[in-house]
């Protein structure tokens, strides 16, 4: 939300550490990152761990990604997670994470007109195939689809949780049950 009379331009950076295995250290160097510019999605797979080899995790958002990195050392640099060097660079290096300590970091730029607001969606998911990841990322890159799905989930849980209600003399027990 921009409550000022001037247009605002924001740089937003998304960061995560993908493990895709039983241990972060054992995953180091084996996470393969693929950025698909046409679908605005980054997919990652663990090529080493046979149990997770066919699992795909993905990140996407409702805005255009400007740059990304899969290299945790590049992103953090001499800084730390609270103050990474990657935030001080004009752009990230667009490199894969193979052979490196992995991360998924990407940046977007958002302009918000004066006295207005803008909604942005960030997606994180897991699928069995890259094509499924792309289809879901495309669907939920639209804000309205996200809002509709949120309402569907709320309705589902209202339905489930509203089926059975227990009333006891103790209000605290009613809450627990």
Q: Positions of the model-derived regions?
A:
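Short Pro-Gly-centered flexible turn/kink motifs
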Residues: 8, 110-128
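Glycine-centered flexibility motif
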Residues: 76-79, 99-101, 125, 170
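Residues at structural and domain junctions
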Residues: 92-94, 101, 119, 139, ...
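Substrate-binding groove/exosite segments of carbohydrate-active enzymes
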Residues: 99-103, 116, 155-177
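Short, well-ordered beta-strand segments enriched in hydrophobic/aromatic residues
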Residues: 1-2, 115
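Beta-strand-rich interaction surfaces with strong enrichment in secreted/lumenal proteins
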Residues: 93-97, 107-112
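Polysaccharide-binding surfaces and accessory modules of carbohydrate-active proteins
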Residues: 2-90, 106, 131-167
């Amino acid at each position: 939300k921009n409550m000022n009379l001037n247009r605002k331009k924001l740089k937003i950076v998304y960061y995560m550490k993908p493990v895709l295995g039983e241990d972060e250290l054992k995953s180091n160097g084996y996470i393969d990152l693929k950025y698909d510019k046409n679908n605005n999605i980054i997919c990652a797979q663990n090529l080493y761990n046979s149990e997770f080899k066919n699992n795909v995790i993905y990140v996407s958002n409702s805005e255009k990604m400007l740059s990304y990195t899969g290299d945790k050392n590049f992103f953090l640099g001499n800084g730390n997670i609270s103050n990474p060097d990657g935030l001080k660079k004009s752009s990230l290096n667009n490199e894969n994470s193979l052979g490196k300590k992995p991360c998924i970091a990407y940046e977007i730029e958002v302009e918000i007109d004066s006295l207005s607001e803008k909604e942005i969606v960030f997606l994180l998911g897991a699928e069995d195939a890259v094509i499924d990841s792309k289809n879901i990322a495309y669907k939920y890159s639209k804000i309205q689809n996200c809002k509709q799905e949120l309402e569907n989930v709320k309705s589902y849980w209202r339905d489930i949780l509203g089926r059975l209600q227990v009333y006891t003399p103790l209000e605290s027990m009613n809450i627990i049950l």
